[in-house]
A protein has these predicted regions:
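Membrane-interface helix-loop junctions in multi-pass transporters/channels
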Residues: 1-123
Length: 123
């Protein structure tokens, strides 16, 4: 791994993290039990990475600098698996089973569909 790759991942991760912070701050303001911001961030990340993979495959572009910037950096900073699991832990602890099932389903099912949508758009 060279220094340029590290910079690309660092910059993309910073932007993705700031966007996730902003989404979460404004979308979770009035919600008590459903962490909408994490879901929105994860779904956007799934869509972006689906688009990116399909675009690179369609035009046979080598996965280098911009790919690192967007997929590893931006999507890595934007999406948040650890927060997702922590949210599920709190829902289980507080016995919010219906919310837990909804949250789990939204993130996994819609996440998969958003990746597929991104791929279909660029195929």
């Amino acid at each position: 791994m060279d220094f340029k790759s590290i910079i690309f991942v660092f910059l993309g991760g910073g932007v993705g993290s700031l966007i996730r912070f902003t989404i979460t701050k404004y979308s979770d303001k009035n919600l008590i039990s459903f962490p909408l911001g994490t879901s929105i961030s994860n779904l956007i990340g799934c869509f972006v990475i689906g688009c990116l993979i399909a675009y690179y495959d369609k035009y046979n572009i080598p996965k280098k600098d911009i790919y690192l910037l967007v997929s590893v950096g931006f999507c890595g900073g934007l999406t948040t698996f650890s927060t997702f699991i922590l949210d599920i832990f709190h829902m289980l602890k507080n016995e919010n089973l219906l919310t837990l099932l909804s949250y789990f389903s939204v993130n996994f099912i819609l996440g998969f569909l958003f990746i597929c949508l991104g791929i279909l758009i660029f195929k």
